[in-house]
From Swiss-Prot:
Entry protein name: Probable small nuclear ribonucleoprotein Sm D2
GO cellular component, one term: U4/U6 x U5 tri-snRNP complex
Key words, A-Z: Cytoplasm, mRNA processing, mRNA splicing, Nucleus, Ribonucleoprotein, Spliceosome
PROSITE patterns hit by this protein: SM (PS52002)
Lineage of source species: Eukaryota, Metazoa, Ecdysozoa, Nematoda, Chromadorea
Organism of provenance: Caenorhabditis elegans
GO function term, MF aspect, one: RNA binding
Tagged with keyword Ribonucleoprotein: yes
Sm domain span: 29-115
Major localization listed first in the record, in broad terms: nucleus
């Protein structure tokens, strides 16, 4: 039976460490690992329809994250009066110096699309 097919409960400490290292450096979590190591920005789409652009300082396998220098962006549609005119949505943002983001609110994490390619 290979290490991949074994349940975690049956793995040795070395096998667990190797599997975790592979998950964080090769799999989808590698984007977060690279962001922490190289201090790159990432863009995070959240379930509340807001976007976060910031630097990841720490994270875990559940995508809980500690972020710094975060720009939170969202759009709001202002309430209109009695007129039948449709209101235009307004882009809003705010700066957050440090924050903890719970992983269950994360939909998507991508490298900063506006950063120059390296």
């Amino acid at each position: 039976m290979s290490a991949q097919a074994k349940p975690r409960s049956e793995m040795t400490a070395e096998e667990l460490a190797a599997k975790e290292d592979e998950e964080f450096n090769v799999g989808p979590l590698s984007i977060l690992t690279n962001s922490v190591k190289n201090n790159h920005q990432v863009l995070i789409n959240c379930r509340n329809n807001k976007k976060l652009l910031g630097r990841v300082k720490a994270f875990d396998r559940h995508c809980n994250m500690v972020l710094e220098n975060v720009k939170e962006m969202w759009t709001e549609v202002p309430k209109t009066g009695k007129g039948k005119k449709k209101a235009k949505s307004v882009a809003k943002d705010r700066f957050i110096s440090k924050m903890f983001l719970r992983g269950d609110s994360v939909i998507l994490v991508v490298k900063n699309p506006l950063a120059q390619a390296e």
